[in-house]
Amino acid sequence: MSLTVYMNHGQIDMRHALLSHAHEALNQDNNLTVYYIVPNHVKFDSEVDVLRRFARLTGQNPDTSLYAQSRLQVYSLSRLTWALLKDMATMQPNVIQGTGLFIMVSDILRDYAAQLPIFARMQSKAGFVTTLVAQLVELRASRISPEDLLTILNQESDDDTFLRQTLSGKLRDLAIVADALDKKMGHTYITQQEVLSFFATQLATTQLKNVAFYFDGFNGFTSPETQVMIELMARYPVTVALLGDVEKLGSQQPGDLFYKPMTTAQRLAQFTKIANQQVVWQVPTQARCLDESIISVMSAWEKLGEYRQFNSENKKTNLAAFVAENTMVEIQEVARRIRQLLVAQPDLRLRDILILARDLTPYTGHIPEVMQQFDLPYFLDTDQKMTNHPLVELLLNLLRPAKERFQYQQVMAILKTGLLRPYTDGSLVPEGDFFDIVSYLDNYLYANQPFERTWRDLDHPFTLFTVSEDEDDEDARVVLDDKTVNRRIETLRRFVIDAFDSLQQQLNQAQTMRQAATLIILWLEKYHVTEAILSQRDTLLAAGELSRSREGEEVWEMMTQTLDDIVAIDGDERFELEKFKAILVAGFEGATFSGIPNNLDQLTISEAGIVQSNDYQYLFFIGGTRNNLPAQLKSRALINDAERLIVQPALQENSTPKYLQNTAQQQMAEENLLFYGALTAATKNIVLSYPALDAGGQISDMSPFFKRLVDAFNITVNKVTATPATSQALLKYYVGSVRSTLGELVKIAASQQQTSAYQALRNTINQSEPERLERVLSAPNYKNQTETLKPELVQALFGETLNMSISQLESYYNNPLAYFLQYGLALKERLTNRLNVAQTGTLYHAVFEGVVQQLIIQQLSLRDISQKALQQLVADNMAEITAQPAYQMLQETGKMRATQHYLAKVSEILAVNMQRAARVNHAQPKAVERLFGFPNRQSLPALVVSTPQATVHLRGKIDRLDSQDPSQVYGTIIDYKSNGKHFDWGQAYDGRQMQLLTYWQAAQLSAEQLGIEAIGGAFFAKIAPEKLTIKDFKGDVRAMLRGEIKPEQFKYRGLFISEPAYIDSLETLAEGEGSQFYQLKKKANGELYANSDVISPEDFELLLKRNLDNIQRASAAILSGDFPLSPAEGSLQFTPFTDVLRFDRALGDQYKNNTPKNKSDILKLLKADEE
């Protein structure tokens, strides 16, 4: 028996040497079976390549005839273990998965808590148990026993540093847990990482006949793999191919390029000699079929990777490098170059091209979009975690505490998986129909946020409704939607309740973990979750998504495996929901999908840390920045890097040396070898690239690995920009697929669009996709401007007669296009019934309406009743209104009931404020919520305004009308507002504030019907308190905390006529005195100050005329279909249509011209208009 080591550099065809040796051995011994071992990740590709090559060695042509071989079998080490163990006498213990270990270790931490001072504190940290499990697995795989740990602990040392003290405590706890875990596992279980160790023990007691082992593609071996190698080398012929230089064996130093494989070779030779077996060193010479440039690059890195000088007589190479603006531009440029390669070389296949990165994370979000844009099928050869799969989402949300299950986020997360669907007429509800009604239920739940109590109140069906916040009607009105939709929502509601209750019943019945696992599986089957998984699989298969189609089954298998572990290990333990869920989480977090390519010919995108085949023709190495290459590794193991430097020497002093995994620093020292392995993957050409700006927008420098090669060959690093500088540059460098090229064509400046290069590309694209070309090329000329609607469309949307509220006209002047969206197309933002500012204002509004209405019935005013009676009246109305469905959220929780109590107290304060204001005059309320322009008998006539196009009927609702004096000569209009609104002269002139003036005009037309002679004033009344953040509060904080802060001063703000009798009816003031409740103050001579809310009758007539003109202009514009994007400044802050409007001043959009706000300036404009 012997160990044969083939060693040379990456340019040499090691596989040819191994296969030639195997062929010779097979010819010499007809009974011999050769096991050819390759890394697991490249097993399939390697098997195909090995058999094709071996066929040629036997004189056959695999390209023209089928070839099979039973005496040479290609395996990964794990598959070889399985293949040989199944025929051995000793039964392999059960392999425990990570979830089983998680269960055992969790139990140990609970049972031994008093003996684990360090771990008891660390256990509260998220992920600690998982980290501890990983450390225990590493120890077991390396055959490091609790006794080994205690030996290290008991060694005398002069090191009294904090690090040593911490390590001692950690090792003591680790030894206790490891010992307890050994007892729990016994001979029944082994970890997945111990399977090779078990295989090694069986090899020591089992004699295989007529076998030889060949190892290809390895740079080193883990501790369990080394154990297998030791047993094989002691008994059978073993041949290994490793990178290195035989002549330098024994003189290699850490940091040398081939330090790891050469050290591995030495260790293997040492073990072989200990077994009294022969070691043969071979230096193969047959070169791989490589392009000269690849040979030059590999030769260069063999020196540069060790910081040695490289001098090449021939520095001409096909090595290329570029720097892109950012990661998106970089991956686009790579895709573009691949497209160009495919066109230039018709025989080239996508499977011959490899894209590598040291870390693909910055690119994973861009890859799907870019590859679709360039029409390149690809296989992303990285681990895809299971944690985001719908089945995982379903399970983890279902296993939340019962009180959380009916929350909006949880319900929608469960339903949107598509795995919990109603089952009718012998089949699941189709996905399309199901998600349609789920979207309606989503809207309802989002709007109402019902708690579990509301869910279960089946006497009150879930009815889709909207809350209107129109300025002319602030009442929340419930509007029934389509009856069919409501019925389907209610059906889905009952299905959800039934499913959740059934699950909770199962969980309540479960006394042990075994029962819980069983009942959950039964529940999933009862609600046809398995059928839903298969349905999703079939849909994905039909769409050609072969890889994704298996994901559901893989997650199900992972779940059942985890449940099996729970039953086997903790089956008789008392069921605890949180522990049960934590075990499932641990299982899913460590699980990944098995990647299966969708196509035979597709691009491979992978990471440099993953073993790759070395028969790709082209390599694109992306992301080569200083921060990514070499990788900046950090150890997350329980025994950290600093502690490993203490532990490792002690372990190697044993008679049988044992090894922990390398520290992060040791792994980083191997980055030069990892990069060399990436370079060996290509046979023709290599392209290096990196982004100037990383994914976070930070400036990136070139990787030192890249820089050494670039400098050695004097390579020009081309700069790739997101936009071609000229049309010639576009034609030369930016041509890819039709779609991608069109995306670049549209970026060309107008000055370059008449060049022959631009026209040639345009004509070429026009032949295949003329419509897309026209649409895309017109995009830069797009102006964010509206077009005038056709008359027939205007009539269809608005009718021949405009029936509208004054707030709608105001919204037109604020933002014409938003008016069209809201009132023409009837667009609405997503329904919500949260208690926002508008909702609270609506509530206050309704309360005061009810209070004043009762006073009118009793022919009283606010001043005629006591404060206590008023407060009781407010409380009664508040209770009545909050009992309505629109305010049901105020009854849902203790917090919301406290909010209701707060609103009631605020209402009382506001009512008392209005009562104090009422005591300064003799005003008497005559009407509340008085409608005009509505089609009912109680409504006052509409305000009718004629335009050349049509007649406009204006409607509205006067919140309150007071008779201001005992003679009932003057009336006063009161309009409640949630904010402290004042009369804005500039907005009134522009048509953005017409409400008071229009209500004034409408009421004046119906003065006789209202029982007054004339309207003397119209005012806004603020009915919601101002909210301040604590940082804006300027008063006494201690008084605020004691609840002693006085409420803000209540004041009516608006407009009134300068008639002395009316002014005196508001409040009788002496000369020099000011009103507390009105913006009204007299000078010493009896005249009013200019800042009073007063206007002369003459000026008021001009203002009313301007108001009518505004109504006519807006109406005419609406009926003419004129809805320009011309918002008033500040109006976009409150519109829900910003995504539709896409207003951007940087692109030329303009606000309306500002009008002066000063009263005197507006009066000058009015008089000028009149002249």
From Swiss-Prot:
This is ATP-dependent helicase/deoxyribonuclease subunit B. Its cofactor is Mg(2+). Its EC number is 3.1.-.-. Despite having helicase-like domains, this subunit does not have helicase activity. The heterodimer acts as both an ATP-dependent DNA helicase and an ATP-dependent, dual-direction single-stranded exonuclease. Recognizes the chi site generating a DNA molecule suitable for the initiation of homologous recombination. This subunit has 5' -> 3' nuclease activity but not helicase activity. The keyword Cell wall biogenesis/degradation does not apply. Pfam families: ADDB_N (PF21445), PDDEXK_1 (PF12705). GO terms for biological process: double-strand break repair via homologous recombination. One of its GO terms (molecular function) is hydrolase activity, acting on acid anhydrides. Heterodimer of AddA and RexB. Belongs to the helicase family. AddB/RexB type 2 subfamily. The lineage of its organism: Bacteria, Bacillati, Bacillota, Bacilli, Lactobacillales. Keywords: ATP-binding, DNA damage, DNA repair, DNA-binding, Exonuclease, Helicase, Hydrolase, Nuclease, Nucleotide-binding. InterPro entries: ADDB_N, DNA_helicase_suRexB, P-loop_NTPase, PDDEXK-like_dom_sf, PDDEXK_AddAB-type.
